[in-house]
Amino acid sequence: MSGTKAKRDLTEGPLFVPIFTFVVPIILTGMLQILYNMADNIVVGRFSGDELALAAVGSTSSLSNLIINLLMGIAGGAAVVIAQSYGAKDYEKLSRAVHTSILFSVIGGIFFCVLGLAISRPALLLMATKDELMSRALLYLRIICLGIPASAIYNFGAAVLRSVGDSKTPLFILSSTGLINVLLNLFFVIVCKMSVDGVALATIISQYVSAAVVLIILFKRKDAPYTLELPKISIDPTILKRILALGLPAGFQGTLFSISNIILTAGINQLPTTDISGKTIAINIEGLVYTAMNSYLHASTTFTGQNYGAKKPDRIKKSIFYTVLQVFIVGFVGGQIINFFGEPLASLYIDANDPNKEAVMAAALELMSFMLSCYFLCGIMDTLSGAMRGLGYSVIPMIISIGAICVLRAIWIFYVFPMEEFHSLIGIYTVYPLSWSLGLIALGISLFIVYRRIKKKLSAEDSISLSAEAVK
């Protein structure tokens, strides 16, 4: 695909359909990631012959997501800088942002890989991981940490592509490497008789292939303003400062979500192993809906970012409205569909010979039914957060996350969860819709105020520009 065809100007023309066509490849990409993750869990749950393997994998997810969320947040900062530069047609700045982003992803990925390896055991102990799960969870987590550099490179590369309107190429990459992941899962677990180490190894191999492919694509797009050129790969301090100013708050926001989830996981780990396995299954399946909704965060960031760069406030407002409308529909309808097929989907994860299969199934279905009925609230909250980032405001969503999400969830786990009536899976997860609702309201009010300021600012700049032209 040529660079010309691979870039889209989102500052002209209709919005509703282009937003949807932009989001569909991102949704499919995310769905593939979830399906491949489901394959990991299905293979380890059904074919490893180890009834504790699935619970061990599930007990590490919040911790591994913590580091990935920080890197993805910084990648989001790069996406905003690139989208705004592209909308303003400042291709020289765009190129500097791309080269800075890629080099930073390599450095950051290696740093967090080492950090993850160092804190794996103490972090699992802090999360109250059960003794019978510890050795398996630690092995899985350490192998996954080895893939962090590849994950960082891929996510920054994909952010570059999405920022210029190309959401199809990441789909192509993930569809190819995901298949590799599934085949390696089956090979390592069934043929090589491995367990959690097999699925972790399959995951990081596919991640390194993804990273290599996205770099090759960026190097080969010679006629695109975002093409990678080896001599230009360096850190531009001014660009990096802007990326970090936008990306670190977003990264910390994602990290705070992960920390709050780690706190909740510590509570969940106090429950029976069947509940932990049921939670792992439910969250895995719910991920299909979450991933579809989360795609609108990327859409709102890209569309508002490009139109902010192009100084078009009316298109910014329409972009926000259409992304919120679409994410509500996707979240509500998608939740009902997944709920309807909940039992056959959950049964894929459970070994027919597992003596605890009925208890695991009951826990999974109960949690899915509860969470999916209100998941659209999370989607709207994330979409509003993406719009704020696209407009260059990353600190406000972070502050809201600290209060509405992290503090509330911490209070819940320490003071509400110990109560007998709340000491259950549903009792602990009741805090989720409450925190989403608070976050949504706070972000909605903040975005309204920010938009009015931006519209006033852009209108004033337009007036000055017109006056200058009149003088000429």
Could you describe each region identified by the protein language model?
Residues 21-40, 143, 154, 177, ...:
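Transmembrane helical elements of multi-pass membrane transporters/channels
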Residues 31, 35-54, 124-131, 187-194, ...:
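Helix-terminus/linker motif at the lipid-water interface of multi-pass membrane proteins
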Residues 33, 37-44, 68-75, 79, ...:
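Alpha-helical transmembrane segments and their lipid-water interface positions
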Residues 51-62, 141, 200, 273-288, ...:
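Small-residue hotspots at the loop-to-helix junctions and early N-terminal turns
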Residues 75, 144-162, 170-178, 199-214, ...:
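Short runs within selected transmembrane alpha-helices of multi-pass transporters and secretion channels
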